[in-house]
Amino acid sequence: MSSTVWILISILLATVGAVVGFFVRKSIAEAKINGAANEAKRILDEANREAEALKKEALLEAKDEIHTLRTEAELEIRDRRSELQKQENRLMQKEENLDRKDETLDKRELQLEKKEDSLVARQQQIEELESKVGELVQKQQTELERISNLTREQAKAIILGKVESEVSHEIAVMVKESEVRAKEEADKKAKEILSLAMQRCAADHVAETTVSVVNLPNDEMKGRIIGREGRNIRTLETLTGIDLIIDDTPEAVILSGFDPIRRETARIALDKLVQDGRIHPARIEEMVEKSRREVDEYIREVGEQTTFEVGVHGLHPDLIKILGRLKYRTSYGQNVLKHSMEVAYLTGLMAAELGEDEKLARRAGLLHDIGKAIDHEVEGSHVEIGVELATKYKEHPVVINSIASHHGDTEPTSIIAVLVAAADALSAARPGARSETLENYIRRLEKLEEISESYEGVEKSFAIQAGREVRILVKPDTIDDLEAHRLARDIRKRIENELDYPGHIKVTVIRETRAVEYAK
């Protein structure tokens, strides 16, 4: 029972505490609400006061801004008025100027009208004077025709003939002076380029023969080479196409033939047979075939070495092999391969001096005589064969034209083609480069003098300097100075057309006038 009472008391106390707490909290909340309301009222009052102050401040600032804008607007209006006034003044001034110009133009127009009237009157006077002058001229012409017994056309023809004679003489003099100046300048420039090229190119003096000599260990070997009833020597000559000359020359056999490649093949084969000691037809045939292969390989190596030395690359392999064959070809005793290399060097050097393509120039110079490698096997001149080869192996058009034109058969179409022809002549004409037989030499000198003396007015001619120059003495009363120049050109053209010669020939016409008096 006591526990129940305590529980009830506890519940009662809790209830009383809750009620008391509720009222206490309510009173506290009401107090807070009243305080918040008072604070809110205070804040609202302060905000109203601040808003009033800001309003007054904004009004003041707005008034100041309005005053400032009004002042600026007044200033701008004043400036615009001033500018408009200035523009108006300028327009008025321009209008006054235009008025003055208009007056000036009116005055000028009046002056021009007066001048036009004056010119019309003057033109009429001139026409009248021209008419009178025409009548006077006609009368004078009629009188002159009556006095001179010549018509107008006849007199005109006589005057024109005299003028033509005088003018033709003056033109000839001017042409001569121009030729002299052009020749001097061209010779000077050409000598500079050629001297530079020759100084930088050192070439060998080459002389080739048509025989080769094979040394023997003893004279007994000659009998073995001949063989029983000459079978060995006949076999060797048949296979190589070379003549073997076995005479009293001690320990030597001479090989004679005009084909250097065959002669070289025979020399190598015979040398191998002599070293081997076994000499009979079957062995000879074997050695000749082996030697032929060695020569072909050597020719290919020579072609490759040549292109490497000259600096020409990209040639067709067959063209390289044909180029190597030039080592065994000669022209007037000059080795054609050495000549081609020399022409390539000279052409390249001259092309470099003139600003042309040096590599292309060397290529053209190296291949200019390529036709000589097979001209004894194929029909046609070496120029035609060379053009066919270059075209077949798709060489540059400049190279093809250089081959075709280096002997003047066709016109050169490029500077490089002209340089190739010049280098070819330079290489062939240098001392010691080529040789010719005595008979051909004498025939050429006689032909030079015969051509020179075939012209009227030539007194005597002399071929000098081994046929490099011909001097012609003319009659001074028959040929004047201008005719002497024409004679030199005509003789030069005939020499170029009728003679075949290496290098160039100088034609000199000498006209000498002597005045002789005797004092007594």
UniProtKB/Swiss-Prot annotation:
<keyword id="KW-0694">RNA-binding</keyword>
<dbReference type="InterPro" id="IPR004087">
    <property type="entry name" value="KH_dom"/>
</dbReference>
<dbReference type="Pfam" id="PF01966">
    <property type="entry name" value="HD"/>
</dbReference>
<keyword id="KW-0378">Hydrolase</keyword>
<keyword id="KW-1133">Transmembrane helix</keyword>
<dbReference type="GO" id="GO:0003723">
    <property type="term" value="F:RNA binding"/>
</dbReference>
<dbReference type="InterPro" id="IPR022711">
    <property type="entry name" value="RNase_Y_N"/>
</dbReference>
<dbReference type="InterPro" id="IPR036612">
    <property type="entry name" value="KH_dom_type_1_sf"/>
</dbReference>
<dbReference type="InterPro" id="IPR017705">
    <property type="entry name" value="Ribonuclease_Y"/>
</dbReference>
<dbReference type="Pfam" id="PF00013">
    <property type="entry name" value="KH_1"/>
</dbReference>
<feature type="transmembrane region" description="Helical">
    <location>
        <begin position="4"/>
        <end position="24"/>
    </location>
</feature>
<comment type="function">
    <text>Endoribonuclease that initiates mRNA decay.</text>
</comment>
<keyword id="KW-1003">Cell membrane</keyword>
<keyword id="KW-0540">Nuclease</keyword>
<dbReference type="InterPro" id="IPR003607">
    <property type="entry name" value="HD/PDEase_dom"/>
</dbReference>
<keyword id="KW-0255">Endonuclease</keyword>
<feature type="domain" description="HD">
    <location>
        <begin position="336"/>
        <end position="429"/>
    </location>
</feature>
<feature type="domain" description="KH">
    <location>
        <begin position="210"/>
        <end position="273"/>
    </location>
</feature>
<keyword id="KW-0812">Transmembrane</keyword>
<dbReference type="InterPro" id="IPR006675">
    <property type="entry name" value="HDIG_dom"/>
</dbReference>
<dbReference type="GO" id="GO:0006402">
    <property type="term" value="P:mRNA catabolic process"/>
</dbReference>
<dbReference type="Pfam" id="PF12072">
    <property type="entry name" value="RNase_Y_N"/>
</dbReference>
<dbReference type="GO" id="GO:0004521">
    <property type="term" value="F:RNA endonuclease activity"/>
</dbReference>
<protein>
    <recommendedName>
        <fullName>Ribonuclease Y</fullName>
        <ecNumber>3.1.-.-</ecNumber>
    </recommendedName>
</protein>
<dbReference type="InterPro" id="IPR004088">
    <property type="entry name" value="KH_dom_type_1"/>
</dbReference>
<dbReference type="InterPro" id="IPR006674">
    <property type="entry name" value="HD_domain"/>
</dbReference>
<comment type="similarity">
    <text>Belongs to the RNase Y family.</text>
</comment>
<keyword id="KW-0472">Membrane</keyword>
<dbReference type="GO" id="GO:0005886">
    <property type="term" value="C:plasma membrane"/>
</dbReference>
